[in-house]
Every structure is written in C-alpha cells, then in structure tokens.
C-alpha cells in the first residue's frame, strides 16, 4: 500500500507542475534564511517573483522519513501510509480540490519543519486520546477551520474530522485513492 501512496504523490506533483506550466505560474515563497528549504531554486530570477520571494519546486527526498519517535513516545503503531505521505517530498503546503472543495495538503518544507510536524502530530494524538476518540493523523486543512482531513490510524481510511468532535465522514478507502482524486489548484498569494 505504501508504494501506491508514493506513486499517487509522484503523479499529484506532476499534475501540479503541469498546471503551473500551463497557467504560467511560478511557485514562490518569502525567503527567510532561518527557514531555509531544499525546495528553493538557487539564483531564481524571474519577472513574476515578488520582492523578497524566491522560486521553489517540490523536491523528492532520498529516503522516506520515519515516525518511530512518535510511535515510541506514545506507544502506538502508526499506519505506514503516513510516513510515506509526509516523508517522500519536501514541499510547501499544496492547495487542491477534492469533490469541488478546496483543501490544503499539509506538507513538509524542510527537516526542521518535519520535526515541528512531529510535535504537532504528538499533540493531536494526545488530544484524541484525552477525548477518548480513535487516533487520526491530520493530512490537510479545510476552509472551515474546525475541520481537517485526516488518516484514520485504525482503518487506514481518509476521513473528514470535526475538531473536538471526531470523524464526521469517510472520504476515501485509503490515502493513495484520496490523492489520486485531487485536482491541483493555484495557491493564492
């Protein structure tokens, strides 16, 4: 199943780059030397660049990062799909359309960002335990700040979750299928 998630991510990023090219869009991010990323394109000089911004592209990682520290800290086994989802690429968060709803996939910008993600994931899992709800792993944000898209750690399904209340609906049987259904959209600056 993890190979299917990798393949779906590769195809999704290819679709993103195709949309960017077709729409003559340049992905860019405000440059902060203290928040560097392997995604930044060195010496990017493009007429579309905003002042203080630098062009970037998603970068495939050499190896998938591990969530073993979370598993050890919380005595939980995480669905292996989540390590592939967050550990295959470095990228800015990616806007996409799913069933005509605009969402934003949470992605990892750098190794430091991966550490921050792990801290947030631990806090999320601890909150789920406190609320006596099944463990979920967030993967995307929604327009409604009280909703997230998450991976159900028990079933492996992709679900919509209302924060504090739990799972409200199943969106896809697994992460690969969910990613395959995404349509890239241009981010708003």
Segments from the language model and where they lie:
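A surface-exposed partner-binding patch
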Residues: 1-145
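Short, solvent-exposed coil/turn segments at beta-strand boundaries
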Residues: 132-135, 151-157
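A recognition module on extended beta-rich or small alphabeta surfaces enriched in W/G with H and D/E
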Residues: 146-147, 156, 160-189
